[in-house]
Amino acid sequence: VCVAEEPGTDAPDSALEQMARGLSQGLPPGGERPALVDALPEEGLVPNSQRFFHTHQSLNYHYYLARENILNLGTENDAVLARYQAGPSTLMLVDYREESKASEALTSFRDQITGGIEASEPRSGAFVASRQVGPYLIVVLESASGEASETLLNSAATRLQTLQR
């Protein structure tokens, strides 16, 4: 459970933590770790950096990508974001459940972020790469090198192939 305060409020961290614990305890028992989280490559994963979410608003809270919902995220999608030491890099995996929806999201992402290509070095100097594997979208953000982004992209693609329906 993620609980955040609005800018300008002075809620103590202990109160926010207490609220998050209360919400967590109110969730139904038996919840399982989402399979998409298990698809994250283990090598270089920063401990406790995984963030599971569904919507564009949640993505932008954890990692601001764009004002518009360029990935077509919604409650019907599962997504996970994690940081990696190599690079360092940020990796995002999204399950669209249908290849056509993943393809639309990939095209939108590339059109908006990488000029329509798989990998690029945007003006910020950090590398970005993306790929589709069946109904899944893989995005590597803020990688220090093209080689690091490609390695992480390939590792994630290999792990996602084990989840193929």
Language-model-detected regions and their locations in the chain:
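Soluble, non-membrane globular domain cores that form compact, hydrophobic packing
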Residues: 1-165
